[in-house]
A protein has these predicted regions:
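Lipid interaction determinants
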Residues: 24-99, 103-154
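Bacterial N-terminal signal peptides that target proteins for export
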Residues: 1-9
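C-terminal motif of bacterial Sec signal peptides marking the signal peptidase cleavage site
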Residues: 18-22
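Outer/extracellular conduits and scaffolds centered on Gram-negative outer-membrane beta-barrels
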Residues: 9-15
Length: 154
């Protein structure tokens, strides 16, 4: 009886040690700065958001879906190391709409289209193959625009 209990405890110890070694952290933490992680081509996979106008509430709209052949705000991106980016249509065309500049500070990507037009996108999440960006804009008439975009590395 004592031998069976000893064998049983040994079997449990072996199972527990195998269990602990099998549960190691598969995804290592990426300590690179955001300005390095963002480099590459990102394909829009999901978008959600809304537009609210207190002057014309009947025109308010909201969306939450996979991208179609057009987009409400931002499409596919390619961010380059030299501080430039291109935005691409969702219809699969490979020609960028233009080549513009970008900067990053405190998890905020600033897209600079020209000296008068800039957009700030907050980075909510970034991994080796996933990027989640958030856009919020408060209009002068107290209206607001919000968009949350999920991308995969392309």
């Amino acid at each position: 009886m004592r031998t069976l209990r000893l064998i049983g405890m040994a079997v449990i110890a072996v199972i527990m040690s195998v269990n602990f070694t099998a549960c190691s952290d598969d995804e290592e933490e990426d300590n690179r700065p955001l300005s390095e992680k963002i480099i590459g081509h990102w394909v829009l996979t999901y978008k959600e958001g809304y537009i609210k106008d207190p002057d014309y509430p009947e025109d308010d709209e909201a969306w939450s879906h996979a991208p179609k052949d057009e987009y409400e705000y931002f499409g596919n991106f390619t961010f380059r190391e030299d501080g430039t980016y291109s935005e691409y249509e969702l219809d699969g065309t490979s020609n960028p709409q233009s080549i513009e500049k970008w900067t990053i500070k405190d998890n905020i990507i600033t897209l600079i289209e020209d000296e008068h037009e800039q957009y700030e996108l907050k980075v909510l999440e970034i991994t080796s193959d996933k990027l989640v960006l958030e856009f919020y804009y408060k209009h002068e008439n107290d209206g607001e625009t919000y968009a949350k975009m999920t991308y995969k590395r392309g």
